[in-house]
């Protein structure tokens, strides 16, 4: 009963997720926060708190996590940071999208028909690496991918990478950065 579960879904009707949330509510009594892209969905009905907004998934998660940390006395700069967000974040996100568009178009032209695309990451970038490959490329674009951690790269994958192999490497700014940099330095150019 002292548990909060945050669930994110595009449709809000995935059978296994719906069953899991029902079980969590019935057996644990957890409070459920539902982020669902669709405006009508079973997961919205099951959520104690509901947000139906189909963009910026990571931003929603971070905002909720930030608030939990603030409420727990672990984020003393919270109010100042969110005052800055209120002033600048919306416009800055639009500007970043505009600036990224030419790169995104060229990347899409180059990789839209990859037979297989590899995504490599570690540390604080592993979640983004994994979900980008699976959710965006496989589920949404129907393109074959493989996500692999940077530390696993040298245990097999490096044997099959050539100059023509499409590889995207996520390099974070945490203690595992050297692992991803090692992969980046190894990849043939």
Placement of each model-derived feature along the sequence:
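A generic local secondary-structure boundary/capping motif
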Residues: 20, 40-41, 107-109, 157-158
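Glycine-rich phosphate-binding loops that contact phosphosugars or nucleotide phosphates
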Residues: 1-80, 86, 122, 170-188
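Internal helical hairpin/lid segments
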Residues: 127-189
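Short amphipathic alpha-helical surface micro-motifs
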Residues: 31-35, 99-101, 149-151
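Short, well-ordered alpha-helix to beta-strand connector turns
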Residues: 2-3, 46-47, 114-115, 163-165
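Active-site phosphate/pyrophosphate-binding segments
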Residues: 50-51, 57, 69-148
């Amino acid at each position: 009963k002292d548990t909060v579960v945050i669930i994110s879904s595009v449709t809000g009707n995935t059978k296994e997720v719906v069953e899991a949330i029902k079980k969590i509510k019935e057996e644990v009594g957890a409070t459920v926060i539902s982020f669902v892209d669709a405006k009508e969905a079973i997961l919205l009905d099951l959520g104690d708190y509901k947000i139906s907004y189909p963009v910026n998934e990571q931003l929603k998660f971070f905002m909720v996590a930030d608030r939990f940390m603030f409420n727990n006395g672990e984020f003393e700069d919270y109010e100042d940071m969110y005052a800055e967000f209120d002033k600048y974040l919306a416009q800055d996100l639009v500007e970043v999208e505009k600036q990224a568009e030419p790169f995104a178009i060229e990347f899409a032209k180059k990789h839209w028909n990859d037979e297989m695309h590899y995504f490599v990451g570690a540390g604080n970038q592993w979640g983004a690496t994994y979900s980008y490959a699976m959710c965006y490329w496989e589920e949404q674009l129907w393109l074959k991918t493989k996500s692999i951690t940077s530390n696993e790269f040298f245990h097999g994958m490096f044997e099959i990478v050539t100059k023509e192999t499409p590889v995207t490497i996520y390099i974070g700014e945490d203690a595992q950065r050297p692992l991803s940099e090692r992969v980046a330095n190894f990849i043939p150019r």
